[in-house]
Amino acid sequence: MKIAVIGQSLFGQEVYCQLRKEGHEVVGVFTIPDKDGKADPLGLEAEKDGVPVFKFPRWRARGQALPEVVAKYQALGAELNVLPFCSQFIPMEVINAPRHGSIIYHPSLLPRHRGASAINWTLIHGDKKGGFTIFWADDGLDTGDLLLQKECDVLPDDTVSTLYNRFLFPEGIKGMVQAVRLIAEGTAPRRPQPEEGATYEGIQKKETAMINWDQPAEAIHNWIRGNDKVPGAWTEACGQKLTFFNSTLNTSGLVAQGEALPIPGAHRPGLVTKAGLILFGNDDRMLLVKNIQLEDGKMMPASQFFKGSASSALELTEEELATAEAVRSSWMRILPNVPEVEDSTDFFKSGAASVDVVRLVEEVKELCDGLELENEDVYMATTFGDFIQLLVRKLRGEDGESECVINYVEKAVKKLTLQMPYQLFIGGEFVDAEGAKTYSTINPTDGSVICQVSLAQVSDVDKAVAAAKEAFENGLWGKINARDRGRLLYRLADLMEQHQEELATIEALDAGAVYTLALKTHVGMSIQTFRYFAGWCDKIQGATIPINQARPNRNLTLTKKEPVGVCGIVIPWNYPLMMLSWKTAACLAAGNTVVIKPAQVTPLTALKFAELTLKAGIPKGVVNILPGSGSLVGQRLSDHPDVRKIGFTGSTEVGKHIMKSCALSNVKKVSLELGGKSPLIIFADCDLNKAVQMGMSSVFFNKGENCIAAGRLFVEDSIHDQFVQKVVEEVGKMKIGNPLDRDTNHGPQNHEAHLRKLVEYCQRGVKEGATLVCGGNQVPRPGFFFQPTVFTDVEDHMYIAKEESFGPIMIISRFADGDVDAVLSRANATEFGLASGVFTRDINKALYVSDKLQAGTVFVNTYNKTDVAAPFGGFKQSGFGKDLGEAALNEYLRIKTVTFEY
């Protein structure tokens, strides 16, 4: 069929291309004249194909068709006119000329919303259904007979752009092609339009788009979204015309608190909040506006209205500079009248129109493979310099908002000036707790107060979980490629390394960790952990599985590993940063978001870590950190219906309670690393000197505040006395002192309550008849220092033989020479099974003992040798689930099975 296409825009271009693919002959294209030297996309495409293109500025004069225009049209011999999107008035001499007449696309369900702003009015009226109509043109305004209609649901927050992009554009193209096909087949219907329900609304212009505030919130919301992006709903405020975009009625969780924005005629002043601008209808319901355009055309997040643009300019890498130049070339092609694109060049002031926005977005997305870029981003950053900054932030995984304001406590320590955040970290911002509640965090070296830290309340947990859920379901974190997620975690690890001295010093200050150990282990292994799991991000794979075929058809079954969602992580006080890293790195690598509760007594490195996530570009809401009590914060995380996983390290008693709460709330996935009473068996055929050194480390490492510490040493009778003698000699060489001193190897216990428990533990051991060889008391100096302690003659029935001290207390028991099975029986006679160890030169004995020990980790001729690649976790009442290694990822993933039939 010979077709004349009359119209413009990318929509017209796509319809033209599809009609040619269907085999129709497009005999001519009629489009609008070039604007500022730029041709319309429809005309450009037709010219490339050698199709005659006509660009009449008008078809009529004084209501009469121009004869020369009609003559050029008639010379083509078209059998059908197709008007996919046309802004010109076409005379009836042209409309009625072809054998099959003319068909027009209209973006509403006629007879409703006749007129040029049909999409706008569909939204303004709050219609629940939208769609398009293809009708036979007549001499009325959108009144012709109906040929084809398709409808869709209108979502509560749809705008002109989202409705157009989701349905009206892609389905409209298909609809036009289908309509032409029906005409060619002779089956196209002609149904008269009913007059019942018919409406006509005028074209929406800027001067008519002013907001009427004397109506309910829903009506105001519909007005704003119905005018988004063109012409833009506006109001007068702060002495200028403000245009509002991205409105939503979804205000659950929002509190009507913020900086007041007086709006003449409004029922109540607007409130500028961190979420955006809260507005009120005359029914007192809230709506939220996320973007504001100033009178000078500058677009900004509504949350930044009173702040301006506070983010500092990014320094671009060489690769990013190359990308910027490629984007500059795109701007040059789209803006041919601009001699040179500079940072100050404004896209729209240089002549760009909405169609150019679509072109720019598509070109940049093609240039930056996989980038999430939307038309709105161009409106938010109209100058080239701003656009490049926005683009680079997106490529880096940042959200592009202004830098977070961080309040610090500053302390000068050992030639370092520590800057320590002390507020809750929720949704990418440091904020006070509900009611501004705080508590003191104590320096265990001298008992002094380091600073006041925000004390999270139940409402703060709810806010943090909401932020994590939003980041998981709607944020950038769930959209970026797995490899890009890994890149962000690598950057975070690099930043941790750059700040390792500061982090180690904070660990020493807040947790009493010996600085040199903190640098190597607390911080060093944390860095290694994030690097290890960063490498896993793009290697989380499913499988294809052969199943019985549904003959004669066939089947394909595959599995996908998916993140579970919002995770709660509750960490202990012995390794504040390392325990955070062990769990959080795997959690984030799997694609989850997280709410972390650090131990109440050691919050400061976790909050410093939060700051580093901002610097690394981790999107807001992905990581949230809440210092506070277990009874409030930990309990609420366990009970919260939106938390899908809890990772916990701590006592068995609390672990049982968490497990119960997780089961009763929503059957959360749980992993628990709980108490231990790890046995270390030292045989007479060992390397005694090594056994002594490793035995010392197994107990006194990190002041005994070590989950896998050897809770009980079994020493073969023939070397027992010699072993004890050497241990006591080594204990005498240990320097107890300020953990910040580089030659200290034994610092203070973590907090005073724990120190008191250690004193009581030793008193009970003596009372039950164990021999106290050395230590057993607090060191007579300020702070929470406890003497390295050695007990011998410990019998199996004694309290100290069965219960964990979690301190620098060595418990030694004899066993008869050669009685391997008996000592194994004693070693396994515990409800704990976190770790264990054996020292022997006999490989057969080592293998046999390692087989029989009931523990998640067995060390042979070594101790404390954990590694980021080796799974770590316990048996029995020491918990279940793994940290570290590939196995840790499975704790934060769920497996979905998908089966196809074909």
From Swiss-Prot:
Broad class of enzyme this protein falls into: oxidoreductase
Name of the coding gene: Aldh1l1
Species the sequence originates in: Mus musculus (Mouse)
UniProt protein name: Cytosolic 10-formyltetrahydrofolate dehydrogenase
Protein function: Cytosolic 10-formyltetrahydrofolate dehydrogenase that catalyzes the NADP(+)-dependent conversion of 10-formyltetrahydrofolate to tetrahydrofolate and carbon dioxide. May also have an NADP(+)-dependent aldehyde dehydrogenase activity towards formaldehyde, acetaldehyde, propionaldehyde, and benzaldehyde.
Subunit structure, interactors included: Homotetramer.
GO molecular function, one term: aldehyde dehydrogenase (NAD+) activity
InterPro entries xref list: 10_FTHF_DH (IPR011407), ACP-like_sf (IPR036736), Ald_DH/histidinol_DH (IPR016161), Ald_DH_C (IPR016163), Ald_DH_CS_CYS (IPR016160), Ald_DH_CS_GLU (IPR029510), Ald_DH_N (IPR016162), Aldehyde_DH_dom (IPR015590)
UniProt modified residues of type N6-succinyllysine: K38, K660, K767
Site for Essential for catalytic activity, residues: D142
Modified residues (N6-acetyllysine): K882
